[in-house]
A protein has these predicted regions:
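Surface-exposed extracellular loop regions of Gram-negative outer-membrane beta-barrel proteins
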Residues: 1, 27-29, 52, 56, ...
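Surface-exposed, low-complexity loop segments enriched in small/polar and acidic residues
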Residues: 1-127, 155, 181-232, 260-345, ...
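Hydrophobic, lipid-facing positions within transmembrane beta-strands of outer-membrane proteins
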Residues: 49-55, 128-134, 160-166, 229, ...
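Transmembrane beta-strands of outer-membrane beta-barrel pores
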Residues: 61, 78-84, 148-154, 180-186, ...
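Short loop/turn motifs that connect adjacent beta-strands in outer-membrane beta-barrel proteins
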Residues: 62-70, 138-142, 173, 250-256, ...
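Transmembrane beta-strands of outer-membrane beta-barrel proteins
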Residues: 70-74, 144-146, 162, 176-178, ...
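C-terminal beta-barrel architecture of Gram-negative outer-membrane proteins
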Residues: 199, 364-470, 486
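C-terminal beta-signal and adjacent terminal beta-strands/loops
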Residues: 267, 372-375, 433-445, 467-519
């Protein structure tokens, strides 16, 4: 992967400080020519490899039960996976840049303007696994399935998971179904093996908010997050439960209705504490420390400007707030870790109706999902923030997120409904669809009294018409589609583009014409 026309920080800094005629002239009308001495190409060589070997034996009739034969499968699998990420010398620290303004250099600042420094990484993992599956007819109307799998990676603890499922046709048009299972996910090779990676992003500085908005410390600016890999990470493990029914009424041909209730309990969720939470933790620590003996305060998780150049009046504002003065933060150290239990539960409803008539074929699909619970039990560090806010140490407009009740928080809408309609007669077809995403609240806009800023639901409608025809011996299709038919705009949010991009899109009404030929 090669990216051209990037700017080197070290070459740019040297060119701007050059006192000769070769200096970079930022006032030149020909910007590209002026910056040419600092323009570089940036490369990245990423390689991943997966080798597998498996052996399976099956028997459709291991033994017989009154309702029929029992089928079984057993097997063994070996997997070897490797990953190598070779970054450009200007990103991996081979060629380093040190800022003449902040004094920061690698690994906090890379030599490519606008790109975070990233060290080279390589890792590999081998896994042995054995598994077995069984299908057992209990009665003519009831069937059970059982499965078990044991995985033994060479770089983390082994795990054994299982699944049991039951289907019971209690009537000719009603099927009850349920399952209970466990699952696991090992840390990916990057989380477990990368020494560190630096990423930049905007952050709300809780200290600046607490002392006074942008006076004397900015309350929002860009910061580096120094994410540290952790070879001691444990696999994520979960217990999954689901039950529901399928109804296919015999008196309404083509109609199927499904309903399922599900729950997932996951332990050892791999998380980062997060730069916003780290800022709030620094504020709580400063409040607890007090305004005296400020030279003795130290927070190893955050590197701040030690010489912010505050005036006596500005220092007095920190003292009035009861904390020691703090400069802007440059970097936050954040290590991958295993968190406590995460609980997710919800319900899904599906309606599917297919009908053929003399005027064409109709297909209608309605899906609705609702999340009834989404909670991440807090780590000790996060619980300290919750307790500080509950006791009044910090106000409610100092926000933090990622733990606790996550339902309806920052893009985690709890309701989603989709409707699809298809009609086809001969070679002509029409499609209509709609998608509704429910409301959620924007945590960073919470008021000091705890009032939440709610981002309303958003519904978009798409429509298309297509026609199949022949081009010689080949089948071809022409399709005209309108996306976001009603020109719905994304709800307003305090984000970079004015809307919550993690949940919404703001393309407005748009069209496209698609021509496809099958060879």
């Amino acid at each position: 992967d090669l990216t051209e026309n990037r700017l080197s920080n070290s070459l740019l800094q040297a060119g701007l400080n050059d006192s000769t005629s070769s200096a970079i002239n930022i006032f030149s009308a020909d910007v590209k020519t002026a910056l040419a001495p600092a323009i570089v190409d940036v490369s990245r060589n990423d390689t991943s490899e997966l080798n597998t070997f498996d052996f399976k034996m099956t028997n459709p009739e291991v033994f017989n039960m009154p309702a029929g034969p029992v089928g079984m499968l057993v097997g063994f699998e070996y997997r070897s996976e490797s990953y190598s990420d070779d970054r450009d010398p200007r990103l991996d620290g081979t060629i380093q840049f040190q800022s003449a303004v902040t004094g920061l250099g690698f690994p906090f600042v890379g030599d490519v303007l606008g790109s975070s420094p990233t060290v080279d990484t390589s890792a590999k993992r081998s896994t042995n696994s054995v598994f077995a599956e069984m299908v057992m007819p209990l009665t003519n109307k009831m069937e059970a399935q059982f499965a078990m799998r044991h995985e033994d990676p060479d770089d983390t603890k082994s795990s054994t998971v299982w699944k049991a499922a039951l289907g019971w046709e209690i009537a000719n048009d009603v099927l009850l179904r349920g399952s209970k299972s466990t699952s696991f996910r090992v840390p990916n090779l990057i989380q477990a093996n990368q020494l560190y990676v630096t990423r930049s992003g905007n952050v709300d500085d809780a200290v600046g908010e607490f002392v006074g908005a942008n006076d004397p410390l900015d309350d929002r600016y860009q910061i580096q997050s120094y994410r540290i890999g952790n070879p001691e990470l444990l696999p994520e493990e979960s217990d999954n439960t689901s039950w529901g029914f399928v109804w296919t009424p015999s008196n309404i041909e083509g109609l199927t209705v499904t309903w399922d209730d599900w729950r997932i309990e996951k332990d050892n969720t791999i998380v980062l504490f997060g730069r916003t939470n780290a800022m709030v933790a620094d504020l709580v620590a400063r409040i607890n420390y007090g305004p005296d003996n400020c030279g003795g305060y130290n927070n190893p998780a955050i590197i701040r400007d030690q010489n912010p150049g505050y005036t006596s009046a500005e220092i007095a504002k920190f003292a009035a707030a009861g904390i020691c003065p703090a400069g802007e933060a440059f970097t936050i150290y954040d290590e991958y870790t295993n968190a406590a239990t995460r609980s997710i539960a919800g319900q899904d409803i599906g309606i599917y109706y297919d009908i053929s008539t003399e005027v064409g074929d109709f297909n209608i699909t309605v899906n609705h999902s609702e999340t009834t619970e989404f909670e991440q039990k807090p780590t000790n560090a996060y619980q300290a923030l919750v307790d500080a806010q509950a006791s009044g140490v910090i106000p409610f407009d100092i926000t933090f997120a990622g733990f606790g009740n996550l339902a309806g928080l920052d893009g985690n809408y709890v309701e989603k409904t989709s409707v699809k309609f298809n009609y086809r007669v001969g070679d002509l077809g029409v499609q209509l669809s709609s998608l509704r995403k429910g409301e959620f609240y924007h945590s960073s806009e919470t008021r000091s009294d705890g009032t939440r800023y709610v981002i309303p639901s958003m519904t978009t409608v798409n429509a298309s018409v297509y026609y199949w025809f022949d081009i010689g011996d080949q089948k071809a299709r022409v399709k005209f589609a309108v996306k976001n038919l009603e020109d719905e705009r994304a709800p307003l949010a305090d984000r970079f583009y004015g809307f919550f991009a993690d949940a919404h899109q703001d393309y407005g009404r748009n069209f496209y014409l698609d021509i496809k030929v099958k060879f």
